[in-house]
C-alpha cells in the first residue's frame, strides 16, 4: 500500500476532522469539518487507499520569541501532527515532517521549531522528533520542551 504525502486540497477537510476526532480528540477541529482552514497555514495530509491517515499543520511565517532562535524570523512552526494509530511506525509521520521541511526550504525559512505535546506518550513523541532530526533547544517549564531543526 502506497502512501501519498501532499498539500491538503478542498475535500480533505472532513477526512482530517475524522482523523483528529479519532486520534487526537482533544485537538480543536477548527474549520476542518466544513473543509475550511486559514490560508496562512500549511496543511499536509498523508493519504492511503483514499483515506487520510496522517495530517500536519504548521506555519512558515512564525516568530519564535524565546531565547533559543539562532536566526531572525521567519521561523517555521509545526503546530500539530497526527497519524492514524494503525498506520504508525511506517514512516508516515516522518514523511509529513520531511514534506513540511521541503516547503520551509522553498519558502527560505531556515529554522523550524515545535513543542511536543506533554502528557502520556510524551517521551515517545520526543524520541520520534529526535529521530526526525529535531533537537531540544529550550525548556519552557518542567513539562514543555522546545525542539528545532535547520532546513
Task: Specify the residue positions occupied by each region the protein language model found.
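A short beta-loop-alpha structural element at the N-terminal edge
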Residues: 3-16
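Active-site rim helix/loop that mediates acceptor-substrate recognition in acyltransferases
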Residues: 24-49, 65
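Conserved beta-strand in the GNAT
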Residues: 45, 51-62, 77, 82
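A conserved beta-turn-beta hairpin within the catalytic core of GNAT-like acetyltransferases
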Residues: 61-78, 88, 110, 143
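A short, internal acetyl-CoA/4′-phosphopantetheine-binding micro-motif in the GNAT/acyltransferase core
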Residues: 80-88, 117-118
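Conserved acetyl-CoA-binding loop-helix of GNAT-fold acetyltransferases
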Residues: 83, 89-102, 127, 131
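Conserved active-site alpha-helix within GNAT-family acetyltransferase domains
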Residues: 94, 118-138
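Conserved GNAT acetyl-CoA-binding A-motif
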Residues: 104-118
